[in-house]
Swiss-Prot record, chains A, B, C, D:
Belongs to the archaeal-type GTP cyclohydrolase family. One of its GO terms (biological process) is biosynthetic process. It comes from Natronomonas pharaonis (strain ATCC 35678 / DSM 2160 / CIP 103997 / JCM 8858 / NBRC 14720 / NCIMB 2260 / Gabara). The lineage of its organism: Archaea, Methanobacteriati, Methanobacteriota, Stenosarchaea group, Halobacteria. The keyword Nucleotide-binding applies. GO terms for molecular function: GTP binding; GTP cyclohydrolase IIa activity. Catalyzes the formation of 2-amino-5-formylamino-6-ribofuranosylamino-4(3H)-pyrimidinone ribonucleotide monophosphate and inorganic phosphate from GTP. Also has an independent pyrophosphate phosphohydrolase activity. PANTHER family: GTP CYCLOHYDROLASE III (PTHR42202:SF1). Coiled coil: none annotated. Its EC number is 3.5.4.29. It catalyses: GTP + 3 H2O = 2-amino-5-formylamino-6-(5-phospho-D-ribosylamino)pyrimidin-4(3H)-one + 2 phosphate + 2 H(+). This is GTP cyclohydrolase III. Transmembrane segments: none annotated. Keywords: GTP-binding, Hydrolase, Nucleotide-binding. The gene is gch3. Gene3D superfamilies: 3.30.70.270, Nucleotide cyclase.
C-alpha cells in the first residue's frame, strides 16, 4: 500500500495583491508565478520531492522525505525573496486525493485564501522516518503516442494544444474519480499522476477511456519507490520501455 | 478590424533532449521550462507583448510592436543562457487563430520539431510600423465568479482545480471554433483570450456556453489597443468594473 | 566628446531590511541580490545598456538610449517581483564619474539610503533623442594576459583571486582619479571601464601603472558607439585583436 | 580546531565559450553568471553550506555537511539547466586556505580550466559523518562602521565603492597571509571570512591593520558551528551585538 505525503502550497492573499492598488502588469505576475514554481521545484526537488504548478497560486507537491524543518526552511526562503508569502499544509494518506483533502481542510480551517491575517501557515504532520517504506509513492508518467508526428508537425499549434488539453482534462477527472489519483500536466505531451498503488488494469482502463472519449492515445510508465523523485525516475525509464517495445503500460522492475 | 501579430516559440528538438542520454530529472526540466517562460515574459513583455506558456515546449506570444531585430535578440539571448535553443515564427492576421496557423506552417515547412538540424529558425514578417493602428489587438481577460469562496475555500484543492480546468478546456475550444480566438489559462482562475475584435454578444454567448456545459461561471473584461500589454491592462481594468458593478462583460472605454 | 548617461540603482532601505526582524539567511540575500542584478542586466541590457553589480545594493548602469519611461517600467517591474524596491537616479556628463556624481547627489538630496520613507525615487533627465550621437559612449574591456595559464591552472584559487582583485583595485582607483572613468570587475579576469573618450596613451599609462604597482599585466580593447552594448561589443572584438596580434591596446575601427 | 570542507566550483572551459564563435553579449554572460551563482546559493545553502561568487567562473563554497552524492546532484542539476557545465573539487583541512589548496590541486591535476575534454570533474573526499563536530566551521562576518552615513549618503557612489573595495582588498590579503583565512565580499559593506578558529586578538589585529593601511573601519561578529549556515547566522547575531554595544569584535555565545 502506498503512503503519499502531499503538501498544498498556497500563495497568501494572492488575488487581492495582484490588483492592489491597481492591477499589476500581467507579464510581471507571470514571471513571479513561474519563477516561484521553478524555485519550489528546486527546493522540493532537491530533497527528492515533486511539485506541480497546478493553478500557480495553489501548487501541489509530493513531499515524502521532507520533514517539518524542511518545510519551514522553504517557507522562510520564499518569504525572504518574494513580495508574497506562502502557506504550506501537509497531508498523508494511502490515497493521494485523500491526503490532499486533509491538507486542504487544514488550510481552510486556518482561514480564507484571501484573508490578510492568515499568512505563512504551516500545518500537518509529515510521515515519521521509521514509518517510511520503499513503496510509499507510486508515480505514473503518461505521454501521447507520436504527439510530434500527429500534432506538432501537422496542426495549427493551438489545435495541437487543444488535443493535448482535452486529453489531460479527461484523464485528470477520470483518474481522480476512479482511482483517487492526482494527475498533472507537466508540459509538452506529458502528464504525471500520483497514484494509490493501482494496477495495470486500472491504467489500461484509463487509457482506453481517454481514447474513447476524446480520441487521444496515451501510454504510461509506472514507478514505485520511497520518494517522488525515485518513483518518477523509474516511471520515466518504464515509459522509455513502452516506446521501445510499443506497449501501453510498463511497470518499472 | 484587429491585426494580431502572433509568434510561435518552439524549443528545438526538445523531446529527444529530455531523454538523452538518459531521462533527465523532472524537477530540472520543470525548472528549465518555467524559467524560460519567465524570461520570455520579460523579454517580450517589456516590449509590450504577451507570451503564454501553452505547452511550455511550444509557447504562443502576441508580439505587435516587436520587429525582426527584437525577435533575433530574444533568440540570441535564450541561446546564450540555456542548454536548448528556440525557433521563432511570426504570423499576422485579423484572426489570431489564422495568424498562429501561418506561424505554425512556416515552422513546419522548415522541418520537424524533432529534427536535429532544424535549430534557431526565424521566419515571418512583422507588421510594418506604418500599418500599425490603435485597434490592432483585442485582449479579453476572464475570471471565475467568486472562485475563492466557491472553490478554493471549500473544496479539495484538486476538485477546485478540476472545475477551473474544465471551464478552461471548454472555453478554449469554443472560442477557437466560434470566434477564431486563442484562450490561455494564466493561473489562479484567470484566462486570457486573444480575440478577433468580437462583440459583447459573442462574449456573452461564450460565457453562457461554458456555464451550461460545465457549470463554471465566468465574467470578462475586454480591451483594445496597439499592443497586447496596453489592451491587456485595459481588459484588467474592465474586469475590475465587472466586479464592482456585478456585470458579465465590460469593454474598456 | 563622449556623453555618458549613467543610472544609479539603489535598493531602498536595504541594510535595515536584511536584519529585520532578525538577520535573514545569507544564502537568501545572496540569491536575491544576484537575481536582481541578473534581471537588471536583462531589463537594461535588452535596451542596449550595461549594468554593473558594484556593491549589489548600489549598482551602476550606463543607460544611453533608455528614456524616463523605460526607467519607470524597470522600477515598476522590480517592485512587482521582489520584496524590496529600487530608486533610480540618472546623470549625464561627458565624464562618467561626473555623471555618476550628479546621479548620486540627486538621490542623496531625496533622502538617506536607509530612510524608510524614501522609496522608488526616480530622478534626473535622460539625454534628448535629438542630442544623441554615435560617439556618446566609450567602453574599454580589459583582461589579464594569460590568466588561466599563469594563475587559474597554477595557484591556489584564492591566490589567483587575490591577484585579479589587486589588479582590479589598482585599476579602478587609477582610472577614476586620472581619467574620470568608472571601472567594474565583471567576472573571470575581465574588467569593463566606462571612459571619457580617452586615448591610447592614457590606456597604456594605466596598464603600465597596474603592472608596476601590483604586477598584473592587462590588455584592453576599446569601442565607441551610441550605446553601451554597441560600444562594448566593439571593445570585445578589439580585445580579440589584442589576443591575435599580441598587442596591449586596440581601438575598434 | 576547525575542520573546514571547501569546494571549488569551476565553470568548464568558460573563457573560450564566451567568445565562441564570436564574443557573446556581455549582459547575457552577466545574467548567466549571476543566476548560476544564485542557483548554487540555493543548492548549497539549503544544505547548510555557503558559496561565494569570487570570480564567478571560479566560486568557492564551504560545504560541511554535503556528501559526495549532494555534490553530484548539484553538478547534474547545473548540467541540465545551463549551456555550461561545472567541475567540483572538495578539500578538507583545519586551515581554509589549505583546504582550498587541496581542492585546487585536484582540479589542476585533472586538466586545465580551458581544456575542452576536462568537464564535470568531481574530486575529493568529504568529511565522514562520524568525524564531524560542532566546532568545524568558523565564520566571521565583517561590516564597515556607519558605511551609509559616511559613504553612501555622502560620496559619489563610485568613491563609496572604492573605499569599500580598498578595505576588502586589504582585508582579504591580510587574512589570507596572517591567518590562512578566506575572505569574500558579499555586497553592501559586508565581508564574510572563513577562518581557522582564530581568536579575538587576531581579529582586532586585522581590523587595525585595515584601518591603518586604507582608513576603513571594520567590526566583526564571529560564529562557530557544525555548518557554514549555523556558524554564519551566529556571526550575524554577534555582529548585531557589536552594533548595539559599540564593540569591534564579538563572538557568538
Amino acid at each position: 500500500m502506498t503512503n503519499t505525503q502531499v503538501t498544498l502550497v498556497q500563495i497568501d492573499n494572492y488575488g487581492p495583491w495582484t490588483v492592489t492598488p491597481e492591477p499589476r502588469r500581467e507579464v510581471d505576475l507571470q514571471t513571479l508565478q513561474s519563477r516561484l514554481y521553478a524555485d519550489l521545484s528546486q527546493l522540493i526537488g532537491n530533497r527528492m520531492g515533486y511539485v506541480f504548478f497546478t493553478r500557480f497560486d495553489n501548487m501541489v507537491a509530493v513531499t515524502n522525505g521532507l520533514d517539518a524543518d524542511a518545510h519551514a526552511l522553504i517557507q522562510e526562503s520564499v518569504g525572504n525573496r518574494y513580495p508574497v508569502t506562502v502557506s504550506l499544509s501537509i497531508g498523508v494518506d494511502s490515497s493521494p486525493a485523500a491526503a490532499l483533502g486533509t491538507a486542504t481542510d487544514q488550510l481552510q480551517d486556518a482561514g480564507s485564501a484571501q484573508d490578510k491575517g492568515r499568512t505563512e501557515i504551516l500545518r500537518g504532520d509529515p510521515i515519521q522516518p521509521s514509518e517510511r517504506t520503499d513503496t510509499d509513492v507510486q508515480i505514473a508518467h503518461f505521454d501521447v503516442n507520436d504527439a510530434t508526428g500527429k500534432y506538432t508537425d501537422q496542426l495549427n499549434e493551438f489545435d495541437s494544444f487543444i488535443n493535448i488539453e482535452q486529453g489531460y482534462a479527461e484523464l485528470m477527472r477520470y483518474m481522480r474519480h476512479e482511482n483517487d489519483s492526482l494527475s498533472f500536466f507537466v508540459g509538452g505531451d506529458n502528464i504525471i499522476a500520483v497514484c494509490d498503488g493501482i494496477d495495470e488494469a486500472a491504467y489500461l482502463d484509463a487509457i482506453e477511456h481517454v481514447n474513447e472519449t476524446v480520441g487521444v492515445e496515451l501510454k504510461v510508465g509506472v514507478g514505485l519507490d520511497r520518494t517522488a523523485q525515485a518513483a518518477g525516475m523509474a516511471a520515466k525509464h518504464a515509459l522509455e520501455t513502452c516506446r521501445e517495445e510499443n506497449t501501453d503500460v510498463e511497470f518499472a522492475r
